[in-house]
Amino acid sequence: MFENITAAPADPILGLADLFRADERPGKINLGIGVYKDETGKTPVLTSVKKAEQYLLENETTKNYLGIDGIPEFGRCTQELLFGKGSALINDKRARTAQTPGGTGALRVAADFLAKNTSVKRVWVSNPSWPNHKSVFNSAGLEVREYAYYDAENHTLDFDALINSLNEAQAGDVVLFHGCCHNPTGIDPTLEQWQTLAQLSVEKGWLPLFDFAYQGFARGLEEDAEGLRAFAAMHKELIVASSYSKNFGLYNERVGACTLVAADSETVDRAFSQMKAAIRANYSNPPAHGASVVATILSNDALRAIWEQELTDMRQRIQRMRQLFVNTLQEKGANRDFSFIIKQNGMFSFSGLTKEQVLRLREEFGVYAVASGRVNVAGMTPDNMAPLCEAIVAVL
């Protein structure tokens, strides 16, 4: 039976990590997978996380199963982070949150819930987007369509093309938006553009699904939620798949959340019971450790202050690396203008490098980036910047 199975293609991002590990060149540089690295090239455990873990080590009394939807305090903290403390939506009990195995788990839970319990057949994602979006929705039996997003020539959001292509989306279609730090372009709508999209989506009858993996990495925790909150103010129904991998550095703990919003508390309770049924048939209930860490930090003023400062430090380091990257490329004699990179948000930059140039970077210089030309700015350090920029200039 198994001998007739053909091998799956390597994952475009995680497969790159395998190649990087196997590369024995000492000066190799990994700008592929989206993890934060500090000035020394390490992915650190945050101080706030260590302190929360110490607290849990001393105070945890059981390893019993969690409920299907996870830790209640985690859900409460997640909703406040997304919609703001004192949000009308929270006060009216219109939101329910399930703790999930990472942001990917949240997307799959949302996809399974929609496929089984609604008339949704199509999900619209931006072109380009995170490659795994298509796999997740297709695996749940949903069709994936693309809407225009990026103006490659001007390195900007092509908002007119975005609106035009979404004119094809029908009432009852799901439209997926990146909450902030669009992956892979790093280009986000302005608040005014978010409000236009929110208004349009109400008029057209789309169900908004927000993929929110980078809250705090663009401008700040509150500022980065502006787009989502513009939608929440106008929409009776929406779904948010959020992740704590990046902003808490909890990559391998798989801490995510799927938040369902409906018109009233009775409707959301009914719908959420079906979301829990989808979870029960998938992984039964979530693991406790990472979510306990997040809930401990977010509900403790002292720990939260440490975490917010650490998040600010990470965001500012990435912004410094963007500036240094652009300056160093110029110093090394790049024959094109890369200043657009400074305006992008989050970990990634859509560099404009071609597949061929990316391949040459890897084979000739040991510099690893995704074939689309997406580079992880958080993988850059003052030490690797000069060789990196020399390699890029050599392949231009």
Curated annotation (Swiss-Prot):
Keyword Cytoplasm: yes
GO CC annotation terms, alphabetical: cytoplasm; cytosol
Organism, scientific name: Escherichia coli (strain K12)
Phylogenetic lineage: Bacteria, Pseudomonadati, Pseudomonadota, Gammaproteobacteria, Enterobacterales
Protein name in the entry: Aspartate aminotransferase
Molecular function per GO: identical protein binding; L-aspartate:2-oxoglutarate aminotransferase activity; L-tyrosine-2-oxoglutarate transaminase activity; protein homodimerization activity; pyridoxal phosphate binding
Modified residues (N6-(pyridoxal phosphate)lysine): K246
Family listed: Belongs to the class-I pyridoxal-phosphate-dependent aminotransferase family.
Catalytic activity reported: L-aspartate + 2-oxoglutarate = oxaloacetate + L-glutamate
Induction conditions: Transcription is increased specifically in response to 2,4,6-trinitrotoluene (TNT) and its indicator compounds 1,3-DNB, 2,4-DNT, and 2,6-DNT.
Cofactor: pyridoxal 5'-phosphate
Cellular compartments annotated: Cytoplasm
InterPro entries in alphabetical order: Aminotransferase_I/II_large, Asp_trans, NHTrfase_class1_PyrdxlP-BS, PyrdxlP-dep_Trfase, PyrdxlP-dep_Trfase_major, PyrdxlP-dep_Trfase_small
